[in-house]
């Protein structure tokens, strides 16, 4: 462990002072900060202080984008062909609904309909079971290593990237998050840090504010199109319960819409 407060890419103490005073970090600074935390170049107490300061200030899109880019760069890369038209269907969790894992069912259905799905996920956050729990129960041996993940996609049109396996650099950050015990930027980074960098996304968010923030973040990333949704009654899903907000994201643009299940011939429940 390096007990100094600087790394070759960032002066973490100065960055913390700026964030604590209400200033935003730039995308490159956030990228360097995440790499410094992941490599244990800054002390856990300083890393924890930074995460709390960011939450109190309110993370901006550039900061989240920098964190996501660093996570992808440090991740293990699945053996899937570059430039593929892949989609990830995922939710942030944390909506407190205690729901079934709807995003996994949607991902499997999309694959059955011909989409190439590269799903990135973990175990349960707020649902009765997380995507990894569901897929394990269905007989998929997890984690799939880089080659097996690619083979699974080629054979089935679906594969799953188990986050703890694909993000080994996060091992130094996990104890900090556990010690803090509160929501931080990492609770919304998962859907943005898929190591396969799919060009298409469907993401559910636990609040409209977070959905808008994730949409703004994605608009500056290398994507083709993404839908970020927040559902009726606070769900991180688009459901038949009622209308849902949908942020339609393309590179450089975000359009907010309110959609209703009735628009698609579905009765409310």
Set out the residue ranges of the language-model regions.
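Short, contiguous, pocket-lining structural segments
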Residues: 42, 127, 206-210
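Short beta-strand segments at enzyme active-site cores
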Residues: 46-47, 117-120, 228
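Core alpha/beta catalytic barrel or barrel-like domain that forms the active/cofactor pocket
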Residues: 80-90, 118-124, 186-189
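Acidic, glycine/proline-rich low-complexity segments that act as flexible tails and inter-domain linkers
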Residues: 1-98, 113, 269
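A generic, well-ordered mixed alpha/beta core segment in the N-terminal half of proteins
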Residues: 91, 95-152
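Glycine-rich anion-binding loops and their surrounding alpha/beta cores
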Residues: 2-11, 18, 24-25, 73-76, ...
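Beta-strand segments within the central parallel beta-sheet cores of soluble alpha/beta enzyme folds
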Residues: 49, 65-68, 148-152, 229
């Amino acid at each position: 462990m390096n007990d100094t407060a600087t790394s070759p890419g960032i002066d973490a103490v100065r960055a913390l002072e700026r964030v604590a005073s209400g200033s935003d970090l730039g995308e490159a600074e956030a990228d360097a900060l995440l790499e410094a935390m992941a490599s244990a170049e800054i002390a856990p107490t300083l890393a924890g202080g930074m995460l709390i300061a960011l939450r109190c200030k309110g993370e901006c899109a550039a900061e989240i984008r920098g964190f996501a880019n660093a996570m992808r760069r440090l991740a293990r890369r699945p053996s899937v062909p570059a430039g593929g038209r892949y989609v990830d269907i995922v939710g942030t969790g944390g909506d407190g609904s205690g729901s079934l894992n709807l995003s996994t069912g949607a991902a499997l259905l999309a694959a059955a309909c011909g989409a190439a799905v590269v799903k990135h996920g973990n175990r349960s956050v707020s649902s009765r079971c997380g995507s990894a729990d569901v897929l394990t129960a269905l007989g998929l041996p997890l984690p799939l290593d880089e080659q097996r993940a690619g083979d699974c996609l080629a054979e089935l049109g679906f594969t799953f990237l188990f986050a703890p396996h694909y993000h080994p650099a996060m091992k130094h950050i996990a104890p900090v998050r556990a010690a803090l015990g509160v929501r931080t930027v990492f609770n919304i980074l998962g859907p943005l840090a898929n190591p396969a960098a799919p060009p298409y996304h469907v993401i559910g968010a636990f609040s409209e504010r977070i959905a808008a923030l994730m949409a703004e973040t994605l608009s500056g990333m290398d994507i083709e199109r993404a839908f970020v949704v927040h559902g009726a009654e606070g769900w991180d899903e688009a459901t038949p319960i009622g209308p849902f907000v949908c942020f339609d994201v393309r590179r450089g643009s975000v359009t907010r819409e309110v959609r209703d299940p009735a628009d698609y011939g579905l009765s409310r429940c």
